[in-house]
Amino acid sequence: MAIHADTHDDLRLFQTGEHACGYWSGRQARDLVLDPHDPRLGAIYPQALAWGFRRSGDLVYRPHCERCRACVPVRIAVDAFHPDRSQRRCLARNRDLVVRVVAAERTDEQLALYRQYLKHRHPGGGMDQHGATEFDQFLIGGWSHGRFLEIREPAIAHLPGRLLAVAVTDVTEHALSAVYTFYAPEAAARSLGTFAILQQIQWAQRERRAHLYLGYWIDGHAKMNYKRRFSALEAYDGRHWRGLPAHASVD
């Protein structure tokens, strides 16, 4: 299969075989994947985001299930975003934290937090065995232009505070893409996942980037509901991006 790109060159796509769905137990899924050996992949990636694709490691994929279209690509138009009451409370609750953007280069501290998060979130599923190699392959890859947004406790005696969360973020000319966020399980009361997205929105606003891509939203899936709580959310229907009304947050 091929698609016609703005460069007037053909891009090859591959369809995967069926595999277990990562969102619904008992269902099968399959994906469309841009040719991982295409040397233009890094240059194509910004347009691929606009086509509803997403990055995992060096793979750029989009769900393409035979009988299901539940996965909807979503993004935030950051200039039109306004936090709701719950999100303002999240910002206030975490105003003591230190946020900085660093190079996408693994550190021992980040790896330890990543492994702690996976053991808490995905026990016994294989991901909890990830080490340095899997960290680099899954989060960094070989061609992406990524950054890590680090969230830390306040510094003590001029030493960096404890690392609480890392939001892996791809950077393109006109957008940011939230690739993966991991955080200290014991700090769950801080709503660090939401806080990370709010920080990514502010980052995009500072750098005058139009959108923050959030991956896929699934209507009725409990783990996806948080994405609908952000205002200025847009969904891709396969041809166009259209606005979605925000759902009210539950404090």
UniProtKB/Swiss-Prot annotation:
InterPro entries to which the protein is assigned, alphabetical: Acyl_CoA_acyltransferase, Asp_Glu_LeuTrfase, N-end_Aminoacyl_Trfase, N-end_Aminoacyl_Trfase_C, N-end_Aminoacyl_Trfase_N
Molecular function GO labels: arginyl-tRNA--protein transferase activity; leucyl-tRNA--protein transferase activity
GO biological process, one term: ubiquitin-dependent protein catabolic process via the N-end rule pathway
Organism: Xanthomonas axonopodis pv. citri (strain 306)
Enzyme class: transferase
Enzyme Commission numbers on file: 2.3.2.29
Family: Belongs to the R-transferase family. Bpt subfamily.
Catalytic activity field: N-terminal L-glutamyl-[protein] + L-leucyl-tRNA(Leu) = N-terminal L-leucyl-L-glutamyl-[protein] + tRNA(Leu) + H(+); N-terminal L-aspartyl-[protein] + L-leucyl-tRNA(Leu) = N-terminal L-leucyl-L-aspartyl-[protein] + tRNA(Leu) + H(+)
NCBIfam families found in the cross-reference section: PRK01305.1-1, PRK01305.1-3, PRK01305.2-3
Intracellular or extracellular location(s): Cytoplasm
Recorded superkingdom: Bacteria
Taxonomic classification: Bacteria, Pseudomonadati, Pseudomonadota, Gammaproteobacteria, Lysobacterales
Keywords carried by this UniProt record: Acyltransferase, Cytoplasm, Transferase
Name of the protein described by the UniProt record: Aspartate/glutamate leucyltransferase
Role: Functions in the N-end rule pathway of protein degradation where it conjugates Leu from its aminoacyl-tRNA to the N-termini of proteins containing an N-terminal aspartate or glutamate.
Gene Ontology CC terms: cytoplasm
Pfam families (alphabetical): ATE_C, ATE_N
